[in-house]
């Protein structure tokens, strides 16, 4: 997908408290799939580390959540959406660290 010049990319990385727990992983993935229903999201991807091995690559996270929005305003709307707030309430106990990278075009 080509990102519009005003587009906004929101990339979230989750480190699970119990990375060996298939149940916790599944619960987070189910939560993200529900979260994808927020109307301002253009597209999304739920990913895992690719297993590449170079010094510059961090493979220590458990799940990534890549979101595309039409604008920064749409991303702000997403942040306050009840679906997003419910996700945080129901799933935040699963992770011990979250790191987010937000990008826009030059």
Please provide the spans of the model-predicted regions.
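An amphipathic, aromatic/His-enriched active-site/gating alpha helix that lines ligand/cofactor pockets
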Residues: 38-40, 68-101
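Short S/T/G/P-rich N-terminal loop/turn motif that feeds into the first structured element of a domain
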Residues: 1-62, 70-77, 104-106
